[in-house]
């Protein structure tokens, strides 16, 4: 198969972030390190800075280890118009679906203390009778309320600045993804641009890098991306 054919096959069912997590050596190493605790426990707290796309890590884990066991379910409590009783009933119905192999939950901090307590209780009950893996995404600034419970494993996702040497490869992998998915012309970064970006601290993490690539790909005037 050609490189283009391989790329097309590799991005099926993936978003850009879960694709990068699975195909960048630095991220993949972290992903592989999750395997041992994942065999022992069912509930994980994913702790990361903003812009690291915690849901992508949960989805990457699903695609690499659990996709043949069931479905991936994402539950987001950041929806407007939250109605406690109705939403809780819907949450429980989704959570207890036997087809799930991975459940990712985020924005629990948007709930009241009473809502969080009730949902935490339901999650703990569900985890004892289900084989599905549950991932709860939090930011570093949030209080990890769930860490008070037994049987939880904390997973810290490293920021992009801890993998600065990998930035040129991450940039190229991001370009290839959007070239294949969206039909952009291939672009490459000059050595000067790569060197500059490996010194940048990326406060917006992976999302900032992806946004940068998308902006550059939308400009069709240059084949090579220089420092300017």
What is each stretch, according to the model?
Residues 5-146, 159-164, 179-223:
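AAA+ ATPase active-site-proximal loops
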Residues 172, 222-228:
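Short, flexible helix-to-coil linker/hinge segments that flank and couple to helix-turn-helix
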Residues 151-152:
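As written
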